[in-house]
């Protein structure tokens, strides 16, 4: 057996339909598209969300919510990720240097996820209650 001798099982593959090739083919003249109408035409398709002129669902429902501008410049940092930071005092600049946050981030919040293996000093970052307890348990402290 070689790759060039392989072929599908008999009856497995059928020839593609050649539309518009006479009455006898069953797909002549209108090529299976029916008579007139949008879907019979070239490029004719109903756009997603179009409901035949009725007001579409996405326009019937009310708008809601907004994107907080503060959340765009705020990052969340896991407690376990602080182990990657080599600085003794961890602040925004130290997090940037460790590649934990992007350059556009101006505020960061440390939350309890994972374990802290070394004593660190947190300066100028927001900290959750659980993270604060874990940092102090590891011998670290939090400065405002």
UniProtKB/Swiss-Prot annotation:
GO terms for cellular component: cytosolic large ribosomal subunit. InterPro entries: Ribosomal_uL15, Ribosomal_uL15/eL18, Ribosomal_uL15/eL18_sf, Ribosomal_uL15_bac-type. Keywords: Ribonucleoprotein, Ribosomal protein, RNA-binding, rRNA-binding. Residues 1-54 are annotated as: Disordered. One of its GO terms (biological process) is translation. Residues 21-31 have a biased composition (Gly residues). The keyword Ribosomal protein applies. Pfam families: Ribosomal_L27A. It comes from the Bacteria. GO terms for molecular function: rRNA binding; structural constituent of ribosome. Part of the 50S ribosomal subunit. Belongs to the universal ribosomal protein uL15 family. NCBIfam families: rplO_bact. Binds to the 23S rRNA. This is Large ribosomal subunit protein uL15. The lineage of its organism: Bacteria, Pseudomonadati, Pseudomonadota, Gammaproteobacteria, Cellvibrionales. The gene is rplO.
């Amino acid at each position: 057996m070689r790759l060039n001798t392989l072929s599908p099982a008999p009856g497995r593959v059928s020839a593609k339909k050649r539309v518009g090739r006479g009455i006898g083919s069953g797909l002549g003249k209108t090529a299976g598209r029916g008579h007139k109408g949008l879907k019979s035409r070239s490029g004719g398709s109903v756009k997603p969300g179009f409901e035949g002129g009725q007001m579409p669902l996405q326009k019937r429902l009310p708008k809601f919510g907004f994107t907080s501008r503060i959340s765009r410049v705020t990052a969340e940092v896991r407690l376990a990720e602080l182990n990657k930071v080599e600085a003794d005092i961890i602040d925004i600049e130290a997090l940037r240097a460790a590649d934990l946050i992007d350059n556009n981030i101006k505020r960061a919040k440390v939350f309890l996820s994972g374990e802290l293996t070394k004593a660190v000093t947190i300066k100028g970052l927001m900290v959750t209650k659980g993270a604060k307890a874990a940092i102090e348990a590891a011998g670290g402290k939090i400065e405002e």
